């Protein structure tokens, strides 16, 4: 049963496998990260070079040209990642699409430079969900007595310090001069009955008394007494490590004690490894400050005299840090940085000292503070250290830098504390006056300021300290009392934002939903429902209008201040601003047919601005309406008319060329507001909706009955209708029961019931007349359906196909120039017998719906409402799919399986059972083998062997497909060429399919063994991502083919011209007139032995070397090869045999066969001398240069023999690969790559390796 693999060890490294949807999300996210890193390479020098490249091509490039050009200037970008070439092409393709905003497939220089400028201006405005900082508000929670739970707990003295203990979810605090620690519930404010009282050991005293008895004898009496001592707490610290979970206290009796929480309260804790030994230590001096190093299990204790003592928990020993040049006054705060192996200490002497925890010596001393330091804090993610003191300022440091980075100012009183909220970009500071400032670390900008005050005006709060509670995030301040401040008090996990989202747009290229709310835009991943990024502070005012251009590459945004801007959908950068209105923006339209932007505002003005990419704003004309208010705006691309709807029920039509009014339609009811406009494709009609619940069909030119209503129907109150029906049915049933109990004639009872039902029906008909106001309406051309939302929060779907059929038939008759259509040309169509059908109706929200969006490709409806929710609906059935939620505690995607690293074995989530298909086949074959052994049948064994052969064939074919992306050996080289290739056995870390195919692992898993095939079961929306994935992959594959073809053509062209296109230098072996040149255009001497090369020999040699160098280079960079690994590969027996055969062939080859060589070239014999195996890798490279190997080949030395060890030859191959990376056609790389390993007994005589081994 050797065919079965061993059980997975817990120490084995495993790789999580996610569902295809989550995997595809990770692939796209990785592409975005690589693209962000790639754009950092656009420094001024690179941009200047690219400008010259653009200039050669008339300042514009196509996609393939852009990739070819930029690739040449990104040779040092991410050279060690697998599948680098493919990733580079993917990134450059995404970059091209991101820059090409007009979608013409051509990248202009203006587009490129504008993108670079945009990228620099929006870095601070792009945030993640964690970066977004909300505000703090005062909580109603206050300290309450434990007995009554409604009376306020009063403290006798100031509360000196407060900290949060997550293990028991309590706030620990103590009063000034007290030896007792109190515990408070942060949710209710109730103080615990059980407290922690620090009681020192009693003092043992022996007293003697002398007495004289009656007889005159003297007696001495001895008594033993215990005196109870009192102490006060100086500092407290909680160790959250699971191994300890101990509360430490330092007191003025020079003791530091550890306390453990139990069911009986707090007791002295013992060492985890020795229960008999208590966590208690007596120091020589009082400890005023404590800091814990969780990595090394060390406690740093700061003393009053400025000394720092180290207490090693494991050995219960102590050690002092060096005193020379250290603190001279009491240490106020210390903070450990275990990952950086630093300790920071701040004291009242104003010094901030950074200690090296490895040798316990000073690393740096910062002297920026002019007065004493009171508090320290550290942000591990950004590697920033913060120090606050009595000089009113917070200094920001980087532990690796000697100088100050930044100063946070704004306080007017001495600072008492500074805290970094872990996992966020917030820094909280508190001063002695109770002023609190919230600062954004990444922008160093003030976010919020508030003051901590007490309800009692007679007494000040006198703040002393503060801490924070992580979940839910709260700030706890202590002074005369305890006050709590809640973060994002109005936070609701089901909301999309604190503000109402005015709409929700879908961008297919990003697979993201855009929800503008307030002055920011949130981007939601359509694959997982998570927030991808946030465009913050987009506008000065609140966003009131949001729409996308025709290509969905630009955002058109208007705000409450009348400002309009065009922004990039990829990065949120502002491209340009449109002419400003004097009031709130209502709607913006991108009229692509006339290349204009049309905007309407509350000032009753309509601006028409030319869409001229990055040029200046060109306002074409302005239309001003009087005595009305614009409610909706539309544009007909066929007639090129601007359609304006107003609050008075008038729909006006204006010519876009002249601005003149062409006609209008008015509702019969005055002030019947028009709420929406919808055009019908290929038909001269529009659909309008009103606040009275009417859906109107209005004719447009060229119809002679233009600007007239040809048909309408009403939006009935479905809820009211249903209630009336239920009411009638209920009343009928009640009357029937009453009549049955009174034994009344059944016939008369039925008659009365029918009579009442008829009355109810008439009442219902009266109710129908009160139609619901329509807030939004969208028409779908393909499904012939009309989707609308009303004021009651309902969304409905109407099938209007019969109405459209009549309109289409009538319009076709109008286009008929015969006499038969002349009569119908003048008369509106007849709708007798035409019915519209309500397909479905659904209660979407319990408040008014703000917007309604329809995504036809995904059969998706999106609603936003004033309840701050965004919901996704199935447009076919009206069922709720999911909703966007700002849930901070949302679970991360869970793996569906695990893969053992370095193998093809795949295990379930419990790491107990293999679930890969290969395992399934192995088990099947193993069972068949056992069965055949029992039967003793040889034929069955043969069939098993055939099955194994098929399995091996499938595995080999799979491996061939996975290796398809690796560089292929030249077929002309044969076996000998493969043996010479030093990098033949290198494999990339990941194959192409493994890295870019989201279904790669799913195709290898036995799906019947999976517990679940979804990594994110919380997200119910199923976007058809396969369509986007296949489309992008097909374009990349075709693009790779085009690029390879162009590179081949370019290579042939440069070879014919003898010019290297990359550095524009002449290669000596490509110049026909070599004898006339002594130096190349790069001012480097030409090799002497290269001058006499024949062209035919050089060409053949170059093709072989090119292929081997490129393959070796790609495989080295993909597998991150090291010299030891190369040496082990070169010691392969097969390679040595091939090299031996090649040497023998060269020795035994007759002179006639070598007559084609030029007489000026001597065949160099490079004998390899076995080197010392214990040499370091660094010496190999040093040896290479010490022997001047490089200079000998570069400048054409005539030395006939150079002796090299195997490690040095390996280094030479690496140098060849590096030279090829610099320049693929560099002749120097050809020379280095041809170095071969040979062993010799004499200076020139070569001996086969096999014979030397025998000796």
From Swiss-Prot:
First-listed, main subcellular location of the protein, grouped into a coarse class: other
Pfam families per the UniProt record, alphabetical: WD40
Name of protein: Cilia- and flagella-associated protein 337 B
UniProt keyword Protein transport, yes or no: no
Organism, scientific name: Tetrahymena thermophila (strain SB210)
Residue ranges, compositional bias (Low complexity): 953-969
Domain EF-hand: 87-122
Subunit details: Associates with components of the nexin-dynein regulatory complex (N-DRC) and the CFAP184:CFAP263 complex.
UniProt keywords, alphabetically: Cell projection, Coiled coil, Repeat, WD repeat
General function of this protein: Associates with components of the nexin-dynein regulatory complex (N-DRC), a key regulator of ciliary/flagellar motility, and might act as an inner dynein arm (IDA) hub or linkage.
Gene for this chain: CFAP337B
A cellular component term, taken from the record's GO annotations: cilium
Entry-linked InterPro entries: EF_Hand_1_Ca_BS, EF_hand_dom, Quinoprotein_ADH-like_sf, WD-EF-hand_domain, WD40/YVTN_repeat-like_dom_sf, WD40_repeat_CS, WD40_repeat_dom_sf, WD40_rpt
Spans annotated as Disordered: 941-988, 1140-1160
Claim: Ribonucleoprotein is one of the keywords in the record: no
Location(s) in or outside the cell: Cell projection, Cilium
A single MF term (Gene Ontology): calcium ion binding
SMART domains for the chain: WD40 (SM00320)
Chain intervals with Polar residues compositional bias: 1148-1160
SUPFAM superfamilies with a match to the protein in the record: Quinoprotein alcohol dehydrogenase-like, WD40 repeat-like
WD repeat boundaries on the chain: 228-269, 282-322, 326-365, 368-407, 410-449, 496-536, 538-577, 580-624, 625-664, 669-708, 769-808, 844-883
Protein residues bound to Ca(2+): 100, 102, 104, 111
Family to which this protein belongs: Belongs to the CFAP337 family.
């Amino acid at each position: 049963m050797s065919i079965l693999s061993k059980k997975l060890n817990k120490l084995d490294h495993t790789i999580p496998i996610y569902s295809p949807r989550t995997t595809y999300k990770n692939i796209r996210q990785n592409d975005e990260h690589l693209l962000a890193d790639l754009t950092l390479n656009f420094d001024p020098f690179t941009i200047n070079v690219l400008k010259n490249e653009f200039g050669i091509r008339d300042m514009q490039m196509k996609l393939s040209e852009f990739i070819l050009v930029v690739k040449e200037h990104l040779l040092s970008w991410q050279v060690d990642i697998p599948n680098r070439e493919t990733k580079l092409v993917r990134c450059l393709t995404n970059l091209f699409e991101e820059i090409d905003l007009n979608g013409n497939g051509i990248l202009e220089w203006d587009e490129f430079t504008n993108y670079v400028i945009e990228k620099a201006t929006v870095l601070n405005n792009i945030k993640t969900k964690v970066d977004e900082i909300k505000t703090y508000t005062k909580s109603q929670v206050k300290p309450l007595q434990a007995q009554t739970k409604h009376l306020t707990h009063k403290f006798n003295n100031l509360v000196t310090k407060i900290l949060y203990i997550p293990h028991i979810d309590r706030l620990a605090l103590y009063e000034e001069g007290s030896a007792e620690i109190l515990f408070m519930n942060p949710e209710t404010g109730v103080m615990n009955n059980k407290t922690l009282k620090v009681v020192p050991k009693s003092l043992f005293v022996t007293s003697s008394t002398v007495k004289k008895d009656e007889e005159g004898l003297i007696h001495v009496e001895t008594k033993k007494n215990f005196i109870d001592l009192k102490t006060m707490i100086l500092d407290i610290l909680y160790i959250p490590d699971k191994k300890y979970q101990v509360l430490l206290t330092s007191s003025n009796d020079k003791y530091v004690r550890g306390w453990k929480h139990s069911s009986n309260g707090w007791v002295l804790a013992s060492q985890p490894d020795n229960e008999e030994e208590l966590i208690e230590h007596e120091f020589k001096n009082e400890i005023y400050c404590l800091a814990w190093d969780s990595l090394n299990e060390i406690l740093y204790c700061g003393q009053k005299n400025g000394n720092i003592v180290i207490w090693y928990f494991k050995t219960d020993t102590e050690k002092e840090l060096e005193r020379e040049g250290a603190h001279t006054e009491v240490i106020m705060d210390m903070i450990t940085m275990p990952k950086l192996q630093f300790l920071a200490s701040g004291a009242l002497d104003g010094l901030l000292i950074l200690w090296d925890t490895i040798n316990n010596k000073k690393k740096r001393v910062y002297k920026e503070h002019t007065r004493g330091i009171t508090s320290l804090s550290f942000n591990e993610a950004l590697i920033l250290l913060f120090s606050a003191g009595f000089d009113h300022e917070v200094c920001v440091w980087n532990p690796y830098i000697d100088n100050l980075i930044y100063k946070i100012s704004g306080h007017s009183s001495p600072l008492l504390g500074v805290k970094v909220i872990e996992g966020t970009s917030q820094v909280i500071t508190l001063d002695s006056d109770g002023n609190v400032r919230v600062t954004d670390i990444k922008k160093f900008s003030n976010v919020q300021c508030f003051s901590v005050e007490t309800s009692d005006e007679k007494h000040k709060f006198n703040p002393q300290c503060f801490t924070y509670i992580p979940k839910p995030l709260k700030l706890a301040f202590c002074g005369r009392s305890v006050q709590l401040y809640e973060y994002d008090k109005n936070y609701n996990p089901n909301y999309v934002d604190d503000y109402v989202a005015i709409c929700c747009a879908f961008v297919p290229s990003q697979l993201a939903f855009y929800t503008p709310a307030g002055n920011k835009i949130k981007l939601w991943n359509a694959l997982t429902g998570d927030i991808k990024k946030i465009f913050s502070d987009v506008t000065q005012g609140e966003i009131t209008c949001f729409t996308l251009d025709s290509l969905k590459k630009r955002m058109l945004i208007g705000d409450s201040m009348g400002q309009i801007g065009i922004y990039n959908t990829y990065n949120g950068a502002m491209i340009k601003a449109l002419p400003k209105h004097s009031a709130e923006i209502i709607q913006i339209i991108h009229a692509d047919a006339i290349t204009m932007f049309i905007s309407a505002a509350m000032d009753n003005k309509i601006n028409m601005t030319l869409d001229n990419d990055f040029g200046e704003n060109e306002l074409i004309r302005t239309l001003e309406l009087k005595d009305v208010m614009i409610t909706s705006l539309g544009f007909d691309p066929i007639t090129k008319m601007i359609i304006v709807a107003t609050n008075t029920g008038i729909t006006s039509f204006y010519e876009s060329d002249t601005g003149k009014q062409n006609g209008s339609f008015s509702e019969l009811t005055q002030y019947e507001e028009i709420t929406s406009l919808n055009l019908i494709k290929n038909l001269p009609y529009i659909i309008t909706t009103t606040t009275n619940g009417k859906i109107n069909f209005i004719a447009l030119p060229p119809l002679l009955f233009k600007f007239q209503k040809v048909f309408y129907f009403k939006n009935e109150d479905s809820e009211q209708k249903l209630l009336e029906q239920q009411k009638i049915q209920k009343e009928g049933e009640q009357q029937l029961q009453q009549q049955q109990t009174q034994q009344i004639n059944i016939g008369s009872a039925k008659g009365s019931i029918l009579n009442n039902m008829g009355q109810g029906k008439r009442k219902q008909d009266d109710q129908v007349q009160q139609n619901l106001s329509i807030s939004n309406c969208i028409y779908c051309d393909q499904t012939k359906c009309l989707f609308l939302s009303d004021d009651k929060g309902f969304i409905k779907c109407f099938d209007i196909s019969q109405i459209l059929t009549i309109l289409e038939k009538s319009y076709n008759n109008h286009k008929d120039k015969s006499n038969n259509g002349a009569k119908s040309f003048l008369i509106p169509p007849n709708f007798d017998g035409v019915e519209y059908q309500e397909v479905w109706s659904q209660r979407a929200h319990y408040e008014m719906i703000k917007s309604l969006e329809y995504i036809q490709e995904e059969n998706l409806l999106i609603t936003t409402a004033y309840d701050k929710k965004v919901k996704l609906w199935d447009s076919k059935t009206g069922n709720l799919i999911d909703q966007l939620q700002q849930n901070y505690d949302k679970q991360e995607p869970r793996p569906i399986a695990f893969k053992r690293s370095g193998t093809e074995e795949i295990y379930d989530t419990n790491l107990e059972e293999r679930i890969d298909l290969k395992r399934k086949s192995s088990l099947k074959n193993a069972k068949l083998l056992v069965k055949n052994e029992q039967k003793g049948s040889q034929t069955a064994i043969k069939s098993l062997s055939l099955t194994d052969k098929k399995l091996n064939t499938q595995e080999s074919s799979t491996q061939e497909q996975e290796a398809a992306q690796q560089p292929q050996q030249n077929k002309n080289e044969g076996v000998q060429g493969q043996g010479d290739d030093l990098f033949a056995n290198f494999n990339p870390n990941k194959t192409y399919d493994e890295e870019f195919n989201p279904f790669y692992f799913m195709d290898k898993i036995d799906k019947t063994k999976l517990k679940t095939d979804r990594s994110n079961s919380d997200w119910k929306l199923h976007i058809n991502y396969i369509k986007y994935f296949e489309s992008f992959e097909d374009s990349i594959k075709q693009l790779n083919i085009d690029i390879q073809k162009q590179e081949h053509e370019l290579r042939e062209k440069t070879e014919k011209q003898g010019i290297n296109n990359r550095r524009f230098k002449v290669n000596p072996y490509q110049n026909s007139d070599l004898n006339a040149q002594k130096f190349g255009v790069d001012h480097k001497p030409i090799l002497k032995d290269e001058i006499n090369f024949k062209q035919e020999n050089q060409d053949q040699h170059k093709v072989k070397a090119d292929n081997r160098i490129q393959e070796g280079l790609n495989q080295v960079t993909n597998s991150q090869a090291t010299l030891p690994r190369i040496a082990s590969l070169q010691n392969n027996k097969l390679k040595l045999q091939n090299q031996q055969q090649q040497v023998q062939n060269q020795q035994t080859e007759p002179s006639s066969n070598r007559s084609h060589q030029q007489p000026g070239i001597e065949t160099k014999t490079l004998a390899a001398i076995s080197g010392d195996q214990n040499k370091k890798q660094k010496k190999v490279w040093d040896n290479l240069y010490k022997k001047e190997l490089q200079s000998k080949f570069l400048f054409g030395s005539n030395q006939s023999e150079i002796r090299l060890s195997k490690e040095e030859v390996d280094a030479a191959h690496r140098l060849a690969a590096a030279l090829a990376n610099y320049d693929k056609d560099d002749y120097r790389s050809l020379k280095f790559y041809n170095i071969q390993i040979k062993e010799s007994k004499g200076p020139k005589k070569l001996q086969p390796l096999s014979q030397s081994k025998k000796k």
